[in-house]
A protein has these predicted regions:
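A short glycine-rich, Lys/Arg-flanked "PGG" loop and its adjoining helix->strand segment in the class I
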Residues: 2-19
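Short, conserved clusters of charged catalytic residues that mark active-site
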Residues: 3, 49, 114
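Extended hydrophobic-aromatic, low-complexity segments
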Residues: 1-2, 29-32, 67-68, 77-78
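Acidic/polar loop patches that form or flank catalytic/metal-binding clefts of enzymes
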Residues: 20, 65-70
Length: 135
């Protein structure tokens, strides 16, 4: 993570911006689903940050964290619930493959969307966009 921002710093002029969008462990989904959290996504993610750790990283690498936008959606729920039940994202039973053939009703999906919206408002969604500005 530090090396990425160091590389970005070399590419940006002072005042230049960088957007990094990542899953975050300071989220309801991580706390609720643990190893079944769909965004854990091993081995693609070698390290997962919290809101606090990305703030600290920005300071250490001499960036100003301009904004954090939580932008999670219902995927954090249906993907994690599928993993809990042993259903992969590529399964014919997956909501991502066949919404009409999935284990979730439209009512459940609506509740997932509403919960995601509320979690984003509370900065508790499972992913966020971080806007870094080079000092």
């Amino acid at each position: 993570p530090s090396k990425v921002l160091q590389s970005v710093s070399k590419l940006l002029v002072t005042g230049g911006c960088c957007l990094i969008r990542v899953p975050v462990v300071s989220s309801f989904a991580w706390e609720n689903y643990g190893v079944h959290w769909v965004q854990l996504d091993a081995p693609r993610h070698f390290f997962l940050h919290s809101l606090k750790s990305l703030r600290a990283l920005a300071m250490r690498e001499k960036f100003h964290l301009e904004d954090i936008v939580s932008d999670s959606d219902e995927f954090q729920f249906w993907g994690s619930e599928q993993y809990k039940q042993g259903i992969s994202l590529s399964s014919d039973l997956s909501h991502g493959v066949s919404p009409s053939g999935s284990i979730f009703s439209e009512v459940q999906m609506k509740k997932f969307r509403e919960k995601a919206k509320q979690l984003n408002q509370d900065s508790r969604g499972d992913q966020a966009a971080f806007y870094f500005k080079k000092d």
